Amino acid sequence: MFYSAAVAALMVGSASAFLAPAQFNSVAKSSGALSMKLGSSAEGLIGSDLELPEFDPLGFTNNPAPGALEWYRAAELKHGRVAMLAALGQLVQSFYHLPDPVFSESAKPWQALVKVCNERPLAAVQIGLAIFACEAIGQANQAKPGQAAGDLGWDPLNLRGSNEEIFERAQLRELKNGRLAMIAITAMIVQENLTGYGVIEAYRENAINPFGDGKGFF
């Protein structure tokens, strides 16, 4: 089925998200995207000292290899940013579609993606190429000397400004929203596959109680 091939292509296109952490060995610590004071633990790393300080049940920060923490943070930021776009897209597509029947016949986001991949294979190829281009450009920027983890050198709105304290708060908001979005988009996909309802569709059909109403999973 074309959908399986398309998913495989998209995975290859985003493979640089999992490049070995050794690439960060030569990257000097800077405050470009994260004010990090890293040693052999996450102490001082933005986002590691709130709610559950030093929360690391899997031990990623226990004597990591050189450059590993930067790699972990870059991967976390990348996935968080993608998840924020994905979660927003799940909601937007319930209200707006491109003027093509293949985009507008399903209210279920995941089902719509499968339909697009099967009926508009070139659209899936375009998605894959766009992902590859973003990864290649981002990787080139990330590899610059002195570039901090997650700093892609792209700030068209000049959000960084000149106040480091304000910028660190903005970084923390991005990190926490990204973490929440990763949980949210996972829950949205699970909900759709278990109940048959997308997020907005569930509210429209009053299918918001998962227990005993004949519409939820239980």
Curated annotation (Swiss-Prot):
Family statement: Belongs to the fucoxanthin chlorophyll protein family.
BP-aspect Gene Ontology terms: photosynthesis, light harvesting
Gene Ontology MF terms in the entry: chlorophyll binding
InterPro entries xref list: Chloro_AB-bd_pln (IPR001344), Chloroa_b-bind (IPR022796)
Name by which UniProt lists this protein: Fucoxanthin-chlorophyll a-c binding protein, chloroplastic
Complex and partners: The LHC complex of chromophytic algae is composed of fucoxanthin, chlorophyll A and C bound non-covalently by fucoxanthin chlorophyll proteins (FCPs). The ratio of pigments in this LHC is; fucoxanthin: chlorophyll C: chlorophyll A; (0.6-1): (0.1-0.3): (1).
Pfam families: Chloroa_b-bind
GO cellular component, one term: chloroplast thylakoid membrane
Residues annotated as transit peptide in the record: 1-36
Species of provenance: Chattonella marina var. antiqua (Red tide flagellate)
Presence of keyword Transit peptide: yes
Free-text function comment from the UniProt entry: The light-harvesting complex (LHC) functions as a light receptor, it captures and delivers excitation energy to photosystems with which it is closely associated. Energy is transferred from the carotenoid and chlorophyll C (or B) to chlorophyll A and the photosynthetic reaction centers where it is used to synthesize ATP and reducing power.
Subcellular location(s) per record: Plastid, Chloroplast thylakoid membrane
Superkingdom as given in the UniProt entry: Eukaryota
The keyword Transit peptide is annotated on this UniProt entry: yes
Paired cysteines (S-S): none
Keywords carried by this UniProt record: Chlorophyll, Chloroplast, Chromophore, Membrane, Photosynthesis, Plastid, Thylakoid, Transit peptide
